[in-house]
Every structure is written in structure tokens, then in C-alpha cells.
């Protein structure tokens, strides 16, 4: 087991031990990706850095809001076509692991908020992720939705669980319409499917 120090909202720290199991990750080979998103030209590097700074800023604020405690539902119904942690090869080129869950869905399909929160980023065209939406669920836990064709909410607005927030697309580094749902707790990646399994959604 590993030992963790947990800081509670009232300022006290709790030391707990939890078993941590090994996990095997798949390898996914994706062909037909726009080549400019596999090996970006030099003139795009500044844009990529600027995009990254926007995402970091959107995830930076840590509030005392506890929207995440109501639990999470799937943001869309559809088969899972990409899993968290899989090693990705794009057009045969090895890249970073995939830190989200991909759901196959037609372009224009409705995406709903998996939990309540505040919209921290609503950008229609980031280089890698295309139409991108980030929702803050409180205490540094956030959801990101990538490759969107349209965004239905604005930055600073509050959404409730089940609200329509965006439409599925194939923008950015993508080969076809799908939703890429990602989660972060501060600067730590989180598998969204684990949150679905562990937090109450009823």
C-alpha cells in the first residue's frame, strides 16, 4: 500500500494508506491523422505554446466548491473507441499516451455536462484539440471535452449535471467525429471511467 496525506476543507490533514495496483495499458495505432498535427511545422510552435498556456490557466484555479460530490454521468452515449493511458502511434509516429476516453458519436451529437461546475475555457480552435471546453467541478477537479464542432456555453457560466454544453465534432488532431473526455485533479491526470465507477451519480 501507498501512504497519502489528505488535506480536508477545514484545514486538517489525514494520513491514509491505500493499495495501488499495477495497470496494463494498450497500444493504439491511428492512421489518417492530419500530418501537420503529427509533426507540426515550425510556424505553428508559438500557437501550440499559447494554446497550452490557456489550458494551464483554465485548470489553475482551485475553489472550495464541491460540485463533484454529486457524482458523474457519461457526457454522451456511445461505444468507447479509445481508452485512458493507451500508447498512441499517429501515422506510425509514437506520441504521448492518450489521457482521455474516446466515445464514438456522429458529428453534431449532443454533449452533456457529466457534473455541475463553472466553465473555465470555451475555445473553438486549439491546435491539437480543436473545439475545447473545460469545466471546473471544484477543489481542482476539472473535465475537458475535445474535438468539438460547436460549444453551447460561455466562459464563466455555470452548468448543471445533464445540461447541454457542446456538439461532437472532429476538429484538431482527429480522424473522425468523436468525443474525447478528459479529467484532471490539479496537475494530475485522472481516468474518467474510474470516476464514473466510484462517485455517486444518483
Q: Residue spans of the language-model regions?
A:
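Polar/charged, compositionally biased leader and regulatory segments
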Residues: 3-90
Amino acid at each position: 500500500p501507498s501512504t497519502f496525506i489528505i488535506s480536508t476543507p477545514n484545514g486538517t490533514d489525514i494520513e491514509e494508506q491505500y493499495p495501488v495496483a499495477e495497470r496494463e495499458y494498450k497500444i493504439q495505432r491511428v492512421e489518417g491523422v492530419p500530418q501537420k498535427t503529427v509533426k507540426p511545422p515550425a510556424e505553428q510552435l508559438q500557437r501550440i505554446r499559447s494554446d497550452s498556456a490557456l489550458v494551464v490557466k483554465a485548470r489553475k484555479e482551485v475553489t472550495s466548491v464541491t460540485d463533484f460530490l454529486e457524482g458523474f454521468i457519461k457526457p454522451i452515449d456511445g461505444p468507447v473507441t479509445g481508452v485512458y493511458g493507451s500508447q498512441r502511434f499517429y501515422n506510425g509516429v509514437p506520441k504521448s499516451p492518450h489521457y482521455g476516453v474516446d466515445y464514438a458519436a456522429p458529428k453534431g451529437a449532443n454533449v452533456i455536462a457529466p457534473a455541475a461546475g463553472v466553465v473555465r475555457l470555451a475555445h473553438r480552435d486549439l491546435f491539437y484539440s480543436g473545439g475545447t471546453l473545460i469545466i471546473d467541478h471544484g477543489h481542482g477537479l476539472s473535465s475537458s471535452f475535445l474535438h468539438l464542432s460547436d460549444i453551447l456555453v460561455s466562459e464563466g457560466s455555470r452548468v448543471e449535471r445533464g445540461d447541454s454544453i457542446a456538439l461532437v465534432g472532429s476538429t484538431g488532431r482527429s480522424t473522425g467525429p468523436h468525443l474525447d473526455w478528459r479529467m484532471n485533479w490539479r496537475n494530475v491526470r485522472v481516468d474518467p471511467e474510474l470516476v464514473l465507477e466510484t462517485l455517486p451519480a444518483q
